[in-house]
Amino acid sequence: MSLVERFTNCSCGPCANLNNSWYNATTANLINSGSMTHIVYNVYWPSPGECDPMHLLNKTDNDFRTNYYGCNSVPWVEINGTTFATAGGATGFTNAINTGNSQ
């Protein structure tokens, strides 16, 4: 089983586009098949100030993982600790999950 860690923010337009275009449906299928599980971390930027309520509810863990991976933009996805370029789309994402599961 692969671990996916996704970084996002409630005011991030590209994050919403990613979710609606392929991420939500693809991850639901992979979770239901037992291929992956995922954790979502909310960063405090790009919105001015710290206004993302999901970030504020778990600031310590969100900030720790963001800094651990050096995440400096959102959307950002890690698969088994390796950065995944979200431009790879659903096919690239599924292939990365399957590759991670075969190791």
Language model features with spans:
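Extended polysaccharide-engagement surfaces of secreted carbohydrate-active enzymes
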Residues: 25, 33, 38-66
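Generic structural motif recognizing short loop/turn segments at the entrances and edges of beta-strands
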Residues: 2-3, 34-39, 52, 73-75, ...
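Local sequence-structure signature of Cys/Sec-based thiol-disulfide redox active-site neighborhoods
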Residues: 1-44
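Non-catalytic, surface beta->alpha helical segment in thiol-disulfide oxidoreductase systems
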Residues: 56-57, 64, 69-103
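Extracytoplasmic/secreted cell-surface and envelope-processing proteins
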Residues: 14-16, 48-50, 86-89
